[in-house]
Amino acid sequence: MNKDPVSEERAAAELLLARAAEQERAGDWPAAAGTLQEVLGRWPGLADTWYNLARMQRRCGEPEAALASYARALELGLDGPEEAHLNRGVIYADDLQCAELAQIELQRALALNPNYLPAWMNLANLHEDRGEREAARLAYERALALQPDHPETLARLTNASIIDRADDPLISRLRAALASTGTEWTQRAELGFALGRALDAVGEYAEAWRAYRTANSASRMSALAAGARYDRSAYARYVDALIAAFPAAAATQAPGETTPGRLQSQSVAPSPSPQPIFICGMFRSGSTLVEQILAAHPQVRRGGELPLLPAIVQEHFQPYPQACRSLDAARISAAATAYLQGIKRIHPGAQYITDKRPDNFHHIGLIKAMFPQARIVHTHRNALDNALSIWFLHLDHAMAYATDLGDITHHIREYQRLMRHWHTVYSQDLIDVDYESLVRSPETEVRRLLDALELPWEPACLEFYRQRSLVKTASVWQVREPLHRRSVGRWQNYATELEPWRQALTEAPV
């Protein structure tokens, strides 16, 4: 019996596609991309396969390749082309920081399908990131019209609005939605955080606290259901391991000695070009504000919260931080080169690029091994204000400590312990920026910061809020305003509620 060549080809393609799907489920995205490329090498006309290849390429950190693959899928007549345009828009906005091209792609998606809710949500979010409040609000309203009972849309519309009176209709809508949401934890969290923010804005502090408590409880249940929890003992052991991997003795030890954490040859790291400016500190400590100030300088380009350093840790330094107790020149050089290639892709030709990932304070020792001349900006603020600001935000499950004030307090104290160690080891290379001092005496503090970074004075740094570039953090609206003191001492509105944690948060500062 003769075999049907068409059936054989189809079976071969299906086998490879099944393998790629299994590789994706296993999280092996490079392997999945390789298998999909093998499929397309034999059957290049498969639009869906080009689409899936684009998804894998983006996950592999290849945004330009992903854009090209999405374009090929569109050329081949992909079903649901609005999804490809949406994904191209996300790449332009999140990976390449090209807001104009992102908006074009999102508008193309909406031209194909005016009722495509994800495109309206992403367009609204893009307007938020650009500081275009009214455009963001209108886009969220359009999205809400498509799905009036969508909790996330109502919450985001509230967050993009200026709430200045207690009878604002949005507050009533949030109360009603929260009362009818039932036990859907994610929805209750979204609505509760938005209601808390609105009530706080109009001075209804007691009800705001209750709304935030409901929101954090729901967020915590959602995190636990996803397997995310904050382990205080495990985090303390992690800080212990970081301190052991980069001991104070290594900073002053003579070359050739073998103290853990000392690079065998500190001359191997390539000269940074462009030069990274690392900005880190506790989340919600003013790091976005400092980045916005620096990005107003003509020699500095904004990098945002780059994933580069955590990716390098994952690839080159496992188990971390134990692997850093014995660093070799070749590994450090490879890591530094990979990092520099990553920031060059984001801003080719830039002289300085900011890397504002707050939790990079864990990696200060590794940063100094990769870039011995690096200056690291460390932002900090009043711990009570800091803790409250964290508790008031709906954060990713990766920050599992953020839903419980006891966990937040523990995390802050461990962060303070680690920063005291880094100050001992690298006292000349850490530039501390105190939020309260910055808003009280902005020109003095900005001049001090620029001097420490060996950058010339630039008056535009005091008018940072005039920039129209993308800002993709929870502080998106605050950094669009001139410096103000409204957030200083905010904890006093909730002094009674914060009393159980007050002593722990006010002792042993950085």
Question: What are these language model-derived features?
Answer:
Residues 12, 46, 80-81, 116, ...:
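Residue-level recognition of tetratricopeptide repeat
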Residues 15, 49, 83-84, 119, ...:
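TPR alpha-solenoid repeat register
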Residues 25-38, 60-72, 83, 94-108, ...:
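Structural signature of tandem alpha-helical TPR/SEL1-like repeats
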Residues 43, 77-78, 96, 113, ...:
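A structural motif in tetratricopeptide-repeat
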Residues 139, 158, 171-182, 192-273, ...:
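PAPS-dependent sulfotransferases, especially Golgi type II membrane carbohydrate sulfotransferases
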Residues 261, 267-369:
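Phosphate-binding active sites in nucleotide-utilizing proteins
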